[in-house]
Design a protein with these regions (language model features):
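Conserved small/polar residues in nucleotide/adenosyl-binding loops
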Residues: 1-5
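Conserved catalytic-core segment of nucleotide-activated headgroup transferases in glycan assembly
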Residues: 27-33, 39-40, 174-201, 308-309
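Short internal beta-strands
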Residues: 44-54, 199-202
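Active-site donor-binding segments of glycosyltransferases and PAPS-dependent sulfotransferases
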Residues: 49-102, 106
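Nucleotide-sugar donor-binding patch of glycosyltransferase catalytic domains
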Residues: 65-68, 252-326
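Active-site regions of enzymes building and remodeling cell-envelope glycoconjugates
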Residues: 71-75, 102-103, 117, 126, ...
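Mid-sequence helix-capping/hinge segment at a functional interface
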Residues: 107-181
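Donor-binding and catalytic core of enzymes assembling or modifying cell-surface/extracellular glycoconjugates
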Residues: 179-268
Length: 326
């Protein structure tokens, strides 16, 4: 039963327990719906229950983001287990030990398929909310004052980017597809030669180069990384190059132009796309705008395995310059 119908059917419900078993990017797609849900039920407490383990479906770092989401009163963690085939059959039984008996327990589900126009639309429909005409970007929540670690990286980035064409931020690894781009160093060095300052959360770049800054994820949380980028955006031309992972959604939330490297054929990719993303692909998707797709010829990539391809760094730089170069 949908939440709205359940609340109507049982006025004794005192709160809502939302159960999350997803990755960081997946969470970002939920944020417009969560904000709208809270607007509809402002007096109802929202508790979050998050899987405590890293697996192919889940990241406990989602809990850290929910702790900074003002719409949630409490965040709990549970020991879950993924289903080997069907992600919706995730075992979240352990969550119920901390759910008050007068709370409505709701797993955060969405449909993902060729027939689905967008994941955000699916989430609105799942929770009986009117689907917006235009898909809203993810909502991010930052403190009024940057954390000391954010200020430290901000100082480094400001000094490095001074006088450059802009900053290019790289995220070229994906937990969901178990992939890391193998040409990080060459790509970063090529962008630096083109006059850009390069930042990355993916390891493998030219650490000794003064025009390169790798984010230490042990020092800077994912939300702090986004906060850092939001501050840099106000001072520098800022771009993203990312494989289909967290920073597709994050770049949309931050309003940053993104050269999105679609590293495997996924006919459901329109579920995850935002208009700020120029999609590099070796397969033209009929459900994505054609003008937002950059076709990659066979000579522009090599095979990583039977499913995944690696785009050659010189081609990535060529496409980047064509779309965003000055």
């Amino acid at each position: 039963m949908y939440k709205r119908q359940a609340l109507k059917a049982n006025p004794n419900v005192k709160g809502v327990a939302l159960i999350f078993f997803m990755g960081i990017g997946d969470y970002l797609y939920t944020t417009p719906m969560l904000a709208e849900l809270k607007k509809k039920y402002p007096g109802v407490p929202f508790y979050a229950y998050v899987g405590a383990q890293f697996d192919r479906n889940n990241s406990p770092l989602v809990g850290k983001l929910l702790e900074e989401n003002p719409h949630f009163d409490k965040v709990f963690y549970f020991n879950g287990m993924r289903h080997p085939l069907i992600w919706k059959n995730y075992n979240y039984e352990d969550a119920f030990k901390n759910i008050p008996k007068d709370f409505l327990a709701v797993p955060v589900y969405y449909d993902y398929g060729v027939h689905v126009p967008h994941r955000v639309t699916s989430l609105f429909e799942t929770f009986s909310l009117p689907a917006p005409k235009d898909v809203p970007a993810p909502v991010m929540y930052f403190p009024a004052t940057p954390a000391p670690a954010v200020r430290e990286y901000l100082t480094l980035a400001r000094a490095g980017a001074e006088g450059k064409k802009g900053i290019v931020f790289l995220q070229l690894d994906s937990r969901g597809s178990n992939y890391t781009y193998p040409h990080m160093k060459a790509l970063a060095e090529g962008l630096i030669k083109e006059g850009y300052y390069v930042m990355s959360v993916t390891k493998g770049g030219p650490l000794a180069n003064p025009n390169y800054l790798e984010i230490d994820i042990k020092k800077l949380s994912i939300n702090q990384t986004w906060h850092l980028l939001s501050l840099l955006k106000g001072e520098f031309a800022l771009y993203v190059i990312a494989v289909n992972s967290v920073f597709w959604a994050a770049s949309a939330g931050l309003g940053l132009p993104n050269l999105g490297l679609q590293h495997w054929i996924d006919k459901k990719v329109h579920n995850l796309w935002y208009p700020n993303i120029e999609v590099v692909t070796n397969y033209i998707y009929p459900l994505l705008p054609r003008e937002k797709q950059i076709f990659a010829p066979q000579e522009s990539y090599t095979r990583h395995n039977k499913k995944i391809i690696d785009y050659k760094p010189d081609w990535v730089i060529k496409w980047f310059k064509e779309k965003f170069g000055k």
